[in-house]
């Protein structure tokens, strides 16, 4: 796309150069944002969704720098397991431990982790972890590899990417209730850079607890 293989700074610069050359002054959503919203809208109207119903485990592990690290969370599925999701593209492999400086936690704007994984595959992107509506943590690849999720090469190569399932818009509340996840909290009165935001759906408590367990496991590992 625009002569670039990855969705990173080089692609953004290429798009800006094309816009300038073409005399385009109004910017628009650059691919993934538009794709996610259209995909989520379509998925909400399909009636064949069935949750994966992941069972609790007595012991759970994630893979961090090539090692199995225990995590204090009952619902964890690795890419090598049945019902697991694997990143097939959208990352750079490393054989020496990466210097990881941060987590980048994404609001996936999808109805569930299965849909998020499909969008990532479609866009040639990847993250290390998905957190589903019921708090299930899916690991897509070893944290030792750099996933393409944060836009810039600098941030991709120094971070762990997590997509947390939440379709964001209150109009999807009926979908969550229909599929037995329950209503999401509605967040009101927030501002970003001084600009007021419209109401949006918050995360389930179980998702936030799963995220904290993941942070803790990586920190201790």
What spans do the regions from the language model cover?
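Cell-envelope/ECM-targeting effectors and their regulatory/trafficking segments
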Residues: 1-82
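Active-site-adjacent loop/helix surface patches within enzyme catalytic domains
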Residues: 70-220
């Amino acid at each position: 796309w625009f002569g670039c293989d990855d969705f990173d700074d080089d692609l953004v610069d290429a798009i800006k150069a094309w816009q300038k050359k073409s005399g385009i002054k109004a910017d628009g959503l650059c691919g993934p944002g538009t794709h996610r919203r259209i995909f989520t809208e379509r998925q909400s109207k399909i009636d064949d969704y069935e949750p994966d119903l992941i069972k609790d485990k007595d012991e759970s592990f994630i893979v961090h720098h090539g090692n199995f690290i225990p995590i204090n969370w009952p619902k964890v599925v690795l890419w090598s397991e049945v019902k697991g999701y694997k990143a097939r593209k959208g990352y750079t492999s490393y054989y020496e431990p990466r210097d990881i400086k941060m987590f980048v936690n994404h609001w996936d704007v999808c109805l569930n982790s299965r849909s998020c994984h499909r969008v990532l595959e479609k866009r040639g992107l990847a993250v290390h972890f998905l957190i589903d509506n019921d708090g299930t943590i899916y690991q897509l690849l070893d944290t030792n590899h750099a996933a393409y999720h944060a836009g810039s090469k600098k941030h991709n190569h120094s971070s762990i990417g997590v997509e947390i399932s939440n379709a964001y818009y209150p109009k999807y509340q009926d979908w969550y209730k229909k599929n037995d996840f329950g209503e999401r909290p509605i967040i009101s009165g927030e501002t970003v850079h001084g600009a007021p935001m419209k109401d949006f759906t918050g995360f389930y408590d179980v998702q936030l607890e799963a995220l904290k367990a993941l942070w803790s496991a990586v920190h201790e590992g």
